[in-house]
């Protein structure tokens, strides 16, 4: 599905994290990706150190999460903190969760390569800090136990 969305775009590189999960599935994704996109498809098959992975995420422009289950929320939150444009399937619980919180994420049905507006990027960064700051976490823990 995701590959069908990207096939018509020329000046892109596609990075596919395949270092976790089922190896057979990862191999099939790699094979299909290379067949459809050639050297524009880069399979990430080994784990990176945390600092390397954050640097990698900081260098991408757009992230697409085309799964129907709530997965990769840690990556999504890091990408929000980095001000990246995130596409999700609007029929998923994580799309619903994030939009109800007020994050500006995008429906994959409307995919384009337009850059993230700075105002949207800053909104997401500030909202993330507001909702998940150390102070907010302490407040949440206190209210839970009182």
Regions picked out by a protein language model, each given a short descriptive name:
Residues 54, 74-82, 95-96:
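Short alpha-helical segment that forms part of, or immediately flanks, the ligand-binding pocket
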Residues 13-28, 43:
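Glycosyltransferase donor-sugar binding loop
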């Amino acid at each position: 599905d995701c590959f069908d969305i990207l096939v018509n775009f020329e000046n892109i590189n596609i990075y596919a994290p395949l270092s976790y999960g089922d190896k057979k599935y990862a191999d099939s994704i790699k094979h299909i990706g290379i067949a459809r996109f050639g050297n524009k498809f880069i399979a990430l098959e080994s784990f990176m150190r945390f600092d390397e992975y954050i640097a990698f995420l900081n260098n991408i422009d757009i992230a697409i999460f085309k799964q129907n289950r709530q997965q990769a929320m840690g990556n999504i939150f890091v990408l929000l903190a980095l001000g990246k444009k995130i596409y999700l399937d609007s029929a998923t619980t994580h799309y619903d969760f994030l939009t109800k919180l007020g994050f500006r994420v995008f429906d994959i049905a409307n995919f384009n390569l337009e850059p993230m507006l700075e105002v949207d990027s800053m909104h997401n960064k500030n909202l993330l800090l507001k909702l998940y700051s150390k102070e907010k976490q302490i407040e949440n823990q206190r209210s839970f136990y009182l």
